């Protein structure tokens, strides 16, 4: 427990002092106001706590895996089917929690697209195994937006052991997710979230990299497709090389159909075969140098 940091509550009385397992998720100011992780608070006396209203709307669903395909070398798009007649009433930028039972998975059994197997072999990752003796819970942002109904779509990056140190534990949940195949059953709960767009006319600047694509896609699709927003917006995405880029067709289509939207990619390690003539470097630096440095009012943008 205490690893995901998602079960925050306000403890007004009782509960004792904050534990070391909470300090990585709760700063001193938050701790002073009574913020705690519910999973770490032992109930030994009468307590007064406050939880966010949204918690009372949380539900649980048993979903079925529709697909679980590579989008990049170490990123999969997990698409889940919600039970017929039901829906997850989430907002763009929201997240769900996904449950994994105790399990023992072998990386050699993963379905990895042929174009990515070279890197997996190079680092010896197909020799890795992940054994988990108790149920595990983790949070993932939705990549789909609310009008993509009946499904939940996640972008999941696998947390492998560091290359050359394969004896170290692999990511419990990401290893489980990479092992999922079409037709498998998965339990999720939600919706949760606070990373929501404000209802203003301010310019929107989206910044992401890797599996951080998920909430960006949800937000941008929601703004342009559901809300048909005319706000000026741009998406700045960072990838290692051209092979690690994904959803290109989606964003190219949005840019073609919406004059108020642009998207930009910077590669941090372009390969010779990429023949890349675009921007290079880390995306936060590129955003500053190429745009925000000369922006007339960057403080007015919503990020």
Swiss-Prot record:
Q: Where in the cell is it found?
A: Cell inner membrane
| CDD domains according to UniProt | fer2, NADH_quinone_reductase
Which positions, given as ranges, span the membrane?
none
Report residue spans for region: Catalytic: 201-303
Q: Where is the 2Fe-2S ferredoxin-type domain?
A: 1-45
* Organism domain of life: Bacteria
Report the GO molecular function annotations. 2 iron, 2 sulfur cluster binding; metal ion binding; oxidoreductase activity, acting on NAD(P)H, quinone or similar compound as acceptor
Free-text remark on how the cofactor is bound = Binds 1 [2Fe-2S] cluster.
Stored InterPro entries:
2Fe-2S_ferredoxin-like_sf, 2Fe-2S_ferredoxin-type, Beta-grasp_dom_sf, Cbr1-like_FAD-bd_dom, FAD-bd_FR_type, FNR_nucleotide-bd, NqrF, OxRdtase_FAD/NAD-bd
Q: Which Enzyme Commission number(s) are listed?
A: 7.2.1.1
| Reactions accelerated catalytically | a ubiquinone + n Na(+)(in) + NADH + H(+) = a ubiquinol + n Na(+)(out) + NAD(+)
Question: Gene Ontology terms, cellular component aspect?
Answer: plasma membrane
The residues listed in the UniProt record as binding [2Fe-2S] cluster, with positions renumbered to this chain, are: 4, 7, 39
The prosthetic group or cofactor this protein requires is:
[2Fe-2S] cluster; FAD
Every FAD-binding FR-type domain range: 58-198
GO process terms (BP): sodium ion transport
Keywords attached to this Swiss-Prot or TrEMBL record, sorted alphabetically, are: 2Fe-2S, Cell inner membrane, Cell membrane, FAD, Flavoprotein, Ion transport, Iron, Iron-sulfur, Membrane, Metal-binding, NAD, Sodium, Sodium transport, Translocase, Transport, Ubiquinone
Similarity comment:
Belongs to the NqrF family.
Assembly, per entry? Composed of six subunits; NqrA, NqrB, NqrC, NqrD, NqrE and NqrF.
Function noted in UniProt: NQR complex catalyzes the reduction of ubiquinone-1 to ubiquinol by two successive reactions, coupled with the transport of Na(+) ions from the cytoplasm to the periplasm. The first step is catalyzed by NqrF, which accepts electrons from NADH and reduces ubiquinone-1 to ubisemiquinone by a one-electron transfer pathway.
Q: What is this protein called?
A: Na(+)-translocating NADH-quinone reductase subunit F
Q: What organism does the UniProt record list as the source?
A: Colwellia psychrerythraea
Native organism taxonomy: Bacteria, Pseudomonadati, Pseudomonadota, Gammaproteobacteria, Alteromonadales
């Amino acid at each position: 427990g205490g690893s995901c940091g998602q079960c925050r509550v306000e403890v007004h009385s009782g509960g004792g002092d904050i534990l070391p397992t909470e300090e990585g998720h709760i700063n001193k100011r938050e701790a002073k106001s009574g913020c705690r992780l519910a999973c770490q608070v032992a109930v030994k006396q009468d307590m007064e706590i406050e939880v966010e209203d949204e918690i009372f709307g949380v539900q649980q669903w048993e979903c079925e895996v529709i697909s679980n395909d590579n989008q990049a070398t170490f990123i999969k798009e997990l698409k889940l089917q919600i039970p017929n007649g039901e829906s997850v009433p989430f907002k763009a930028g929201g997240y769900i929690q996904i449950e994994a039972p105790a399990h023992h998975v072998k990386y050699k059994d993963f379905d990895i697209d042929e174009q990515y197997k070279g890197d997996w072999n190079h680092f010896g990752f197909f020799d890795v195994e992940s054994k988990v003796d108790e149920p595990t819970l983790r949070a993932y942002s939705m990549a789909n937006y609310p009008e993509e109904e009946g499904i939940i779509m996640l972008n999941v990056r696998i947390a492998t052991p560091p290359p050359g140190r394969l004896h170290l534990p692999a990511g419990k949940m990401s290893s489980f997710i990479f092992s999922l195949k079409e037709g498998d059953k998965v339990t999720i709960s939600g919706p949760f979230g606070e990373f929501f767009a404000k209802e203003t006319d301010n310019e929107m600047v989206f910044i992401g990299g890797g599996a951080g694509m998920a909430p960006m896609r949800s937000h941008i699709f929601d703004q342009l497709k559901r809300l048909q927003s005319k706000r000026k917006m741009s998406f700045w995405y960072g990838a290692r090389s051209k092979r690690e880029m994904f959803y290109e067709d989606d964003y190219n289509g949005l840019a073609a159909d919406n004059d108020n939207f642009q998207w930009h990619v910077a590669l941090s390690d372009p390969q010779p075969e990429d023949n890349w003539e675009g921007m290079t470097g880390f995306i936060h630096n590129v955003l500053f140098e190429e745009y925000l440095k000369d922006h007339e009012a960057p403080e007015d943008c919503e990020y």
